[in-house]
Amino acid sequence: MGIWKKLTLLLLLLLLVGLGQPPWPAAMALALRWFLGDPTCLVLLGLALLGRPWISSWMPHWLSLVGAALTLFLLPLQPPPGLRWLHKDVAFTFKMLFYGLKFRRRLNKHPPETFVDALERQALAWPDRVALVCTGSEGSSITNSQLDARSCQAAWVLKAKLKDAVIQNTRDAAAILVLPSKTISALSVFLGLAKLGCPVAWINPHSRGMPLLHSVRSSGASVLIVDPDLQENLEEVLPKLLAENIHCFYLGHSSPTPGVEALGASLDAAPSDPVPASLRATIKWKSPAIFIFTSGTTGLPKPAILSHERVIQVSNVLSFCGCRADDVVYDVLPLYHTIGLVLGFLGCLQVGATCVLAPKFSASRFWAECRQHGVTVILYVGEILRYLCNVPEQPEDKIHTVRLAMGNGLRANVWKNFQQRFGPIRIWEFYGSTEGNVGLMNYVGHCGAVGRTSCILRMLTPFELVQFDIETAEPLRDKQGFCIPVEPGKPGLLLTKVRKNQPFLGYRGSQAESNRKLVANVRRVGDLYFNTGDVLTLDQEGFFYFQDRLGDTFRWKGENVSTGEVECVLSSLDFLEEVNVYGVPVPGCEGKVGMAAVKLAPGKTFDGQKLYQHVRSWLPAYATPHFIRIQDSLEITNTYKLVKSRLVREGFDVGIIADPLYILDNKAQTFRSLMPDVYQAVCEGTWNL
């Protein structure tokens, strides 16, 4: 709606006021337009309400009705883009406000209600309900009352052995380093430490040497509890840990290492008397509860702070998305991951559901274990659902009880294939980061979107999508020094506003790293935003689409290239099973040229001509990958995300890469084998890229 039409409506409202008529019908029409995505109507609505005639009839006059009719008549001939989602927007907003009120009631309790209280509540209400099932070699389960009793035993043992050292200083933490095979024991100790008010850092069990030492130090841990199977990892750094007065324990019944005590026998013999809440009475909502390590720009992990408030918020997402007490949740993600620990295990504690923990993800065993345990909710990240779709089809693919899938990183093509093959499973895709202060949620199930917003939600969780410099990874600014918003549908760097009720807690012991994630003066002087480091787009309908991590996006021929977009295009080819796109530097060229590491589908061969025709049809020239690397398998992280850093370092050097390499040949209209002479021509600048 143009500015002149808006001014006409404003004059109409003022005319109604002057005639002593109630302007409510026209004002409500303006409010409807604003809700559907016309924010300038909010200003007009406010002006109209200021002129409301206090002494007038409450019954609308015919003139007011005409004003309302004219307002609605000025809507576009085609409904606004967000109109069809209006009922879901309203329902989600009310649900969000309802959960917010419940959350505030818990916030106002002294001491605040934490996940430990949720465990004790479930143990009293449903003592014999199975809380946790561990698959794999452990193959055990534990009820609510048993889990609460084991955690009480752990609390009493650690309190006695440490002589209150942990709880006397709330800055101290405990660190847990375990393999997935020790899940029940580790979680019992974790909950026991929480009963003492002690924050816990979960460390990746693959950490060794300096990264392990750095993780323990940066978390501020005074206690390290280690899986006996990780003896070698511990002994490499034990002298330095002991020199720093860090108490080390094995989560087993014997200790082969001098200076390290075994906890197993003491845990078995300890009393299971309830731990008084007074031992954790000093904690606040903002107190650290858990440290989750995230990768840093320096290569060393950083301990992101999850406060008790943040833990309750994230763990309640399970309930928010429809998980019930009679559900069984299948969690294949590691406990040192936010989704695996907080959303999965602690989320089940909040709602009273059973959590089935697998030691690791297995595409071949996934559905068999779901059927065996009666799973109704599954959690995913990254490539998990794509791996399930890549398994050969089976007659029993749709024979299961799964009704909900929750997670992030699901591509649109995999979304469709997953639901077509395994049935109408409701997918809750969301976006967020461990240290982030705001998350997004695709609450309407719109394929490919990571979240949705509306005019009201944008007020509740303010954000900005802004232009950025791909080389410096910093937001671009205008002449006044403010960030420059992007147009709808254009990729932009996501910034989320830091407010009192949406704080950024940062990383423990690293104020410089924390400050590096903040951006000031984004829209006005004095405001503060969290830099997610992620590139997203927001379409006209209000849906967010993930484009790339800022570090993965690269620039070629003066254009920004989204690796995620190129991966989606290449993945649609039938002879490619897995695709990982990245940018590599070329001598004498500015920016990076596109390259893709691929895994061929079973029984398929590489077709250079078909690939050439496909990328030329679906990708702009600057986004077309010029090099292809065929691998037997693509390397992934522990959270099932593709690894790009090593591939970028190796580039397309035929001297160090044993995998088959191909290069785009525009003259032959194909991808041909990259031979040493062609490689030399590329490096010398005589091959036209």
From Swiss-Prot:
InterPro entries: AMP-bd_C, AMP-bd_C_sf, AMP-binding_CS, AMP-dep_synth/lig_dom, ANL_N_sf
Organism in which the protein naturally occurs: Mus musculus
Enzyme class: ligase
GO molecular function annotation: ATP binding; cholate-CoA ligase activity; fatty acid transmembrane transporter activity; long-chain fatty acid transmembrane transporter activity; long-chain fatty acid-CoA ligase activity; protein-containing complex binding; very long-chain fatty acid-CoA ligase activity
GO cellular component assignments: basal plasma membrane; endoplasmic reticulum; endoplasmic reticulum membrane; protein-containing complex
Function statement: Mediates the import of long-chain fatty acids (LCFA) by facilitating their transport across cell membranes. Also catalyzes the ATP-dependent formation of fatty acyl-CoA using LCFA and very-long-chain fatty acids (VLCFA) as substrates. Mainly functions as a bile acyl-CoA synthetase catalyzing the activation of bile acids via ATP-dependent formation of bile acid CoA thioesters which is necessary for their subsequent conjugation with glycine or taurine.
Catalytic activity, as annotated: a fatty acid(in) = a fatty acid(out); cholate + ATP + CoA = choloyl-CoA + AMP + diphosphate; (25R)-3alpha,7alpha,12alpha-trihydroxy-5beta-cholestan-26-oate + ATP + CoA = (25R)-3alpha,7alpha,12alpha-trihydroxy-5beta-cholestan-26-oyl-CoA + AMP + diphosphate; chenodeoxycholate + ATP + CoA = chenodeoxycholoyl-CoA + AMP + diphosphate
Residues given in the record as AMP binding sites: I292, F293, T294, S295, G296, T297, T298, G299, L300, P301, K302, P303
Similarity annotation: Belongs to the ATP-dependent AMP-binding enzyme family.
Classification via PANTHER family: LONG-CHAIN FATTY ACID TRANSPORT PROTEIN, LONG-CHAIN FATTY ACID TRANSPORT PROTEIN 5
Protein name in UniProt: Long-chain fatty acid transport protein 5
Reported consequences of knocking out the gene: Mice exhibit a severe bile acid conjugation defect. Display a significant reduction in both liver lipid uptake and content and show a redistribution of lipids away from the liver to other tissues. Hepatocytes show significantly reduced long-chain fatty acids (LCFA) uptake.
Location, primary (coarse class): endoplasmic reticulum
Gene (UniProt): Slc27a5
Keywords for this protein: ATP-binding, Cell membrane, Endoplasmic reticulum, Fatty acid metabolism, Ligase, Lipid metabolism, Lipid transport, Membrane, Microsome, Nucleotide-binding, Transmembrane, Transmembrane helix, Transport
Pfam families per UniProt: AMP-binding, AMP-binding_C
Protein's cellular compartments: Endoplasmic reticulum membrane; Microsome; Cell membrane
Residues exposed to the Cytoplasmic side: 1-29, 76-689
